A protein has these predicted regions:
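Betabetaalpha-Me/HNH-type nuclease active-site subdomain
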Residues: 50-125
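Sequence context surrounding c-type heme c attachment/ligation sites in exported
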Residues: 141
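Short beta-strand-alpha-helix junction that forms the catalytic/metal-binding core
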Residues: 119-138
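Hydrophobic alpha-helical segments, chiefly the membrane-spanning helices
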Residues: 193-195
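Conserved small/polar residues in nucleotide/adenosyl-binding loops
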Residues: 182-189
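A motif-centric signal for short, conserved binding hotspots located
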Residues: 155-181
Length: 195
């Protein structure tokens, strides 16, 4: 088995929830798990949206300055080959830089890329960074970002990837981040979940 297959097996064998929600809006509150499966884990892409042409697209910020949908067709040619730069110049909505000794890594909040730097090479793009808890970032989103990156590196295939943060009312911090991805053309790796 390839590395990406091992990652996928590890993620879904230890799936935190056997329950699958029909949509992200059904997931009303944190249930003690870093992510839950949506729509039977079927990716939310139409046939017309599927492409192997690499691109990335970031929606404009809303009237509160909050990120909206970010989408990409991830391939080797989009992925960076240098380390991520400094992103401290971006202050996403709800940002608070507070350190706690009892929080792993020290920070309760992280600047979270909607489309991970390792997938897109996007650094300090304000349309791609939200305020999220370190837990959501490292336990919820990162395993899937690593899976997609590993898959692309090992197979040289492309992956459709879409992330849309959910903001309740006027809240400046996202209450969840639905992530949908699928490999082209055979859908060997795919997911539809909310972190």
């Amino acid at each position: 088995q390839q590395g990406w297959q091992n990652l996928q097996k590890e993620i879904f064998d230890s799936a935190y929830s056997e329950e699958s929600y029909d949509s992200a809006v059904e997931v009303t509150e944190y249930e003690g798990e870093p992510y839950v499966i949506l729509d039977g884990n079927e990716p939310a892409f139409t046939e017309d949206e599927m492409t192997t042409t690499v691109y990335e697209q970031y929606s404009p910020l809303d009237s509160y300055g909050r990120c909206q949908t970010a989408e990409a067709c991830v391939g080797e040619e989009l992925m960076p080959d240098e380390k991520r730069g400094d992103i401290s110049s971006v202050k996403p909505t709800g940002w608070q830089s507070v350190r706690y000794e009892n929080v792993e890594g020290g920070s309760l909040y992280n600047r979270c890329h909607l489309i991970a730097y390792q997938l897109s090479g996007e650094n300090a793009n304000e349309e791609n960074l939200i305020t999220g808890t370190r837990y959501m970032n490292t336990e919820g989103m990162l395993p899937f970002e690593n899976l997609v990156a590993e898959y692309v590196h090992e197979t040289d295939n492309h992956v459709m990837y879409r992330v849309t943060p959910i903001f309740e009312n006027e809240n400046l911090v996202a209450s969840g981040v639905p992530v949908s991805y699928t490999h082209l053309p055979a859908h060997e790796t795919r997911g539809n979940l909310v972190c």
